[in-house]
Amino acid sequence: MPGTAKKATARVPVTRERALRAAMAVADAEGLAALTMRRLAQEVGVEAMSLYHHVANKDDILDGMVDLVFTEIELPADGDEWKPAMRARAVSARAALMRHPWAINIMNSRIASGPATLRHHDAVIGCCLQAGMSAAMAGHSFSLIDSYLYGFVMQESALPFDETSDIPQILDEMYEPFPANQYPHLTQFTTEYIMKPGYKYGDEFEWGLDLVLDSLEALPRV
Protein backbone atom coordinates (compact mmCIF):
# COMPACT_ATOMS: atom_id res chain seq x y z
CA MET A 1 0.00 0.00 0.00
CA PRO A 2 1.57 3.31 -1.04
CA GLY A 3 2.40 5.56 1.86
CA THR A 4 0.36 8.72 2.03
CA ALA A 5 1.95 10.40 5.02
CA LYS A 6 4.17 13.35 4.22
CA LYS A 7 7.74 13.04 5.29
CA ALA A 8 8.67 15.50 7.96
CA THR A 9 10.83 18.30 6.65
CA ALA A 10 14.31 17.90 8.05
CA ARG A 11 15.27 20.87 10.19
CA VAL A 12 18.73 22.34 9.94
CA PRO A 13 20.14 21.96 13.44
CA VAL A 14 20.71 25.16 15.35
CA THR A 15 24.30 25.77 16.35
CA ARG A 16 25.95 28.77 17.95
CA GLU A 17 27.59 29.75 14.67
CA ARG A 18 24.34 29.42 12.72
CA ALA A 19 22.58 31.63 15.25
CA LEU A 20 25.36 34.21 15.08
CA ARG A 21 25.38 34.20 11.27
CA ALA A 22 21.62 34.72 11.26
CA ALA A 23 22.00 37.57 13.74
CA MET A 24 24.59 39.20 11.48
CA ALA A 25 22.25 38.89 8.49
CA VAL A 26 19.48 40.69 10.39
CA ALA A 27 21.85 43.44 11.53
CA ASP A 28 23.34 43.83 8.05
CA ALA A 29 19.91 44.29 6.51
CA GLU A 30 18.06 46.22 9.20
CA GLY A 31 20.51 47.38 11.87
CA LEU A 32 21.09 46.26 15.45
CA ALA A 33 17.77 47.71 16.62
CA ALA A 34 15.96 44.98 14.67
CA LEU A 35 17.89 42.21 16.39
CA THR A 36 15.97 40.66 19.27
CA MET A 37 15.95 37.17 20.70
CA ARG A 38 12.47 36.64 19.29
CA ARG A 39 13.48 37.82 15.82
CA LEU A 40 16.59 35.65 15.85
CA ALA A 41 14.54 32.63 16.90
CA GLN A 42 12.23 33.22 13.94
CA GLU A 43 15.20 33.43 11.59
CA VAL A 44 16.58 30.05 12.66
CA GLY A 45 13.16 28.43 13.06
CA VAL A 46 13.02 27.71 16.78
CA GLU A 47 11.27 29.01 19.87
CA ALA A 48 13.06 31.89 21.56
CA MET A 49 13.83 29.84 24.67
CA SER A 50 15.64 27.26 22.55
CA LEU A 51 18.25 29.86 21.62
CA TYR A 52 19.52 29.89 25.17
CA HIS A 53 21.06 26.47 24.61
CA HIS A 54 23.48 28.20 22.23
CA VAL A 55 23.79 31.82 23.39
CA ALA A 56 23.54 33.23 26.88
CA ASN A 57 21.85 36.54 26.05
CA LYS A 58 21.97 39.41 23.58
CA ASP A 59 25.36 40.58 24.85
CA ASP A 60 26.72 37.12 24.13
CA ILE A 61 25.29 37.38 20.61
CA LEU A 62 26.93 40.77 20.05
CA ASP A 63 30.25 39.41 21.34
CA GLY A 64 30.01 36.53 18.89
CA MET A 65 29.01 38.77 15.98
CA VAL A 66 31.99 41.05 16.57
CA ASP A 67 34.29 38.06 16.69
CA LEU A 68 32.96 36.86 13.34
CA VAL A 69 33.67 40.27 11.80
CA PHE A 70 37.26 40.00 12.99
CA THR A 71 37.58 36.66 11.16
CA GLU A 72 37.04 38.58 7.89
CA ILE A 73 40.08 40.83 8.41
CA GLU A 74 43.38 39.86 6.80
CA LEU A 75 46.01 39.46 9.50
CA PRO A 76 49.75 40.12 9.33
CA ALA A 77 51.75 36.90 9.52
CA ASP A 78 55.02 36.36 11.36
CA GLY A 79 57.84 37.80 9.30
CA ASP A 80 55.65 40.01 7.11
CA GLU A 81 57.08 43.41 6.21
CA TRP A 82 55.38 45.98 8.41
CA LYS A 83 54.03 48.54 5.95
CA PRO A 84 52.45 46.25 3.30
CA ALA A 85 51.08 43.97 6.03
CA MET A 86 49.46 46.83 7.93
CA ARG A 87 48.14 48.28 4.68
CA ALA A 88 46.52 45.00 3.64
CA ARG A 89 45.03 44.59 7.09
CA ALA A 90 43.52 48.10 7.07
CA VAL A 91 42.10 47.69 3.55
CA SER A 92 40.46 44.39 4.47
CA ALA A 93 39.16 45.85 7.75
CA ARG A 94 37.50 48.71 5.87
CA ALA A 95 35.85 46.21 3.51
CA ALA A 96 34.58 44.14 6.45
CA LEU A 97 33.18 47.20 8.21
CA MET A 98 31.42 48.34 5.06
CA ARG A 99 29.83 44.89 4.71
CA HIS A 100 28.66 45.10 8.33
CA PRO A 101 27.90 48.80 8.99
CA TRP A 102 26.48 48.07 12.45
CA ALA A 103 29.84 46.73 13.63
CA ILE A 104 31.79 49.97 13.79
CA ASN A 105 29.92 51.16 16.89
CA ILE A 106 30.60 48.01 18.89
CA MET A 107 33.86 46.56 17.53
CA ASN A 108 35.94 47.85 20.42
CA SER A 109 33.26 48.02 23.09
CA ARG A 110 33.09 44.34 24.00
CA ILE A 111 34.58 43.21 27.32
CA ALA A 112 34.37 39.49 26.52
CA SER A 113 36.71 39.36 23.52
CA GLY A 114 36.51 36.24 21.39
CA PRO A 115 39.42 34.23 19.97
CA ALA A 116 39.35 35.90 16.54
CA THR A 117 39.38 39.34 18.15
CA LEU A 118 42.37 38.43 20.30
CA ARG A 119 44.20 36.83 17.36
CA HIS A 120 43.68 40.02 15.39
CA HIS A 121 45.05 42.27 18.12
CA ASP A 122 47.96 39.93 18.78
CA ALA A 123 48.89 39.79 15.08
CA VAL A 124 48.76 43.58 14.63
CA ILE A 125 50.81 44.29 17.75
CA GLY A 126 53.18 41.45 16.84
CA CYS A 127 53.77 42.94 13.39
CA CYS A 128 54.70 46.27 14.97
CA LEU A 129 56.99 44.72 17.57
CA GLN A 130 58.73 42.52 15.00
CA ALA A 131 59.37 45.65 12.92
CA GLY A 132 61.49 46.92 15.81
CA MET A 133 58.94 49.19 17.46
CA SER A 134 58.86 49.62 21.20
CA ALA A 135 55.66 48.63 22.96
CA ALA A 136 54.72 52.32 23.22
CA MET A 137 55.35 52.97 19.53
CA ALA A 138 53.36 49.86 18.60
CA GLY A 139 50.48 51.23 20.65
CA HIS A 140 50.74 54.67 19.03
CA SER A 141 50.79 53.12 15.55
CA PHE A 142 47.85 50.79 16.18
CA SER A 143 45.81 53.66 17.63
CA LEU A 144 46.58 56.09 14.81
CA ILE A 145 45.87 53.61 12.01
CA ASP A 146 42.59 52.51 13.56
CA SER A 147 41.52 56.08 14.31
CA TYR A 148 41.90 56.83 10.62
CA LEU A 149 40.25 53.55 9.61
CA TYR A 150 37.18 53.90 11.83
CA GLY A 151 36.79 57.61 11.15
CA PHE A 152 36.89 57.11 7.39
CA VAL A 153 34.38 54.26 7.48
CA MET A 154 31.99 56.27 9.66
CA GLN A 155 32.14 59.18 7.23
CA GLU A 156 31.86 56.93 4.17
CA SER A 157 28.86 55.11 5.63
CA ALA A 158 27.07 58.39 6.31
CA LEU A 159 27.37 59.77 2.77
CA PRO A 160 24.12 60.18 0.79
CA PHE A 161 25.65 58.28 -2.13
CA ASP A 162 27.79 55.23 -2.84
CA GLU A 163 29.84 53.94 -5.75
CA THR A 164 26.70 53.02 -7.69
CA SER A 165 25.07 56.45 -7.35
CA ASP A 166 24.73 59.08 -10.05
CA ILE A 167 26.93 61.66 -8.32
CA PRO A 168 26.45 64.49 -10.86
CA GLN A 169 22.68 64.21 -10.46
CA ILE A 170 22.96 64.22 -6.67
CA LEU A 171 25.18 67.31 -6.75
CA ASP A 172 22.82 69.09 -9.13
CA GLU A 173 19.98 68.49 -6.67
CA MET A 174 22.11 69.72 -3.76
CA TYR A 175 23.13 72.97 -5.45
CA GLU A 176 19.91 73.74 -7.32
CA PRO A 177 18.39 75.91 -4.52
CA PHE A 178 21.44 78.23 -4.45
CA PRO A 179 22.28 81.10 -6.83
CA ALA A 180 25.00 80.40 -9.38
CA ASN A 181 28.52 81.31 -8.18
CA GLN A 182 27.44 81.70 -4.56
CA TYR A 183 30.03 79.09 -3.56
CA PRO A 184 32.78 79.45 -6.18
CA HIS A 185 35.44 77.37 -4.44
CA LEU A 186 33.06 74.49 -3.83
CA THR A 187 31.90 74.71 -7.44
CA GLN A 188 35.49 74.57 -8.69
CA PHE A 189 36.27 71.62 -6.44
CA THR A 190 33.26 69.58 -7.49
CA THR A 191 33.69 70.41 -11.17
CA GLU A 192 37.41 69.70 -11.37
CA TYR A 193 37.48 66.69 -9.06
CA ILE A 194 34.27 65.06 -7.93
CA MET A 195 32.49 65.34 -11.28
CA LYS A 196 35.38 63.71 -13.13
CA PRO A 197 34.55 60.31 -14.70
CA GLY A 198 35.49 57.44 -12.43
CA TYR A 199 35.51 59.44 -9.18
CA LYS A 200 34.93 57.27 -6.12
CA TYR A 201 35.02 58.64 -2.61
CA GLY A 202 36.31 55.29 -1.38
CA ASP A 203 39.56 55.84 -3.29
CA GLU A 204 40.40 58.55 -0.75
CA PHE A 205 40.88 55.83 1.86
CA GLU A 206 44.05 54.34 0.43
CA TRP A 207 45.55 57.77 -0.29
CA GLY A 208 45.14 58.75 3.34
CA LEU A 209 46.19 55.33 4.60
CA ASP A 210 49.47 55.55 2.68
CA LEU A 211 50.09 58.99 4.18
CA VAL A 212 49.55 57.61 7.69
CA LEU A 213 51.79 54.59 7.09
CA ASP A 214 54.54 56.64 5.42
CA SER A 215 54.52 59.07 8.34
CA LEU A 216 54.75 56.27 10.90
CA GLU A 217 57.50 54.53 8.98
CA ALA A 218 59.60 57.70 9.02
CA LEU A 219 59.44 58.03 12.81
CA PRO A 220 61.92 56.53 15.30
CA ARG A 221 60.66 53.12 16.40
CA VAL A 222 61.29 53.59 20.10
Regions found by a protein language model. Name each.
Residues 166-222:
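A structured, mid-to-C-terminal "fold-capping" secondary-structure block
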Residues 1-39, 43-46, 55-63:
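Basic, helix-initiating cap at the start of DNA-binding domains
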